[in-house]
């Protein structure tokens, strides 16, 4: 996952991918 913790939080709203799974 190349998504940063900060970006994940902001992207998680529109992008529901590995970020939410990792969180």
UniProtKB/Swiss-Prot annotation:
One of its GO terms (cellular component) is extracellular region. One of its GO terms (biological process) is killing of cells of another organism. Signal peptide: none annotated. Its main location: secreted. The keyword Mitochondrion does not apply. The lineage of its organism: Eukaryota, Viridiplantae, Streptophyta, Embryophyta, Tracheophyta. This is Defensin D4. Keywords: Antibiotic, Antimicrobial, Cell wall, Fungicide, Plant defense, Secreted. The keyword Secreted applies. Distributed in the epidermal cell layer of leaves and in the subepidermal layer region of stems. Not in roots.
């Amino acid at each position: 996952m190349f998504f940063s913790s900060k970006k994940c939080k902001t992207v998680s709203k529109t992008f529901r991918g590995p970020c939410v799974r990792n969180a």
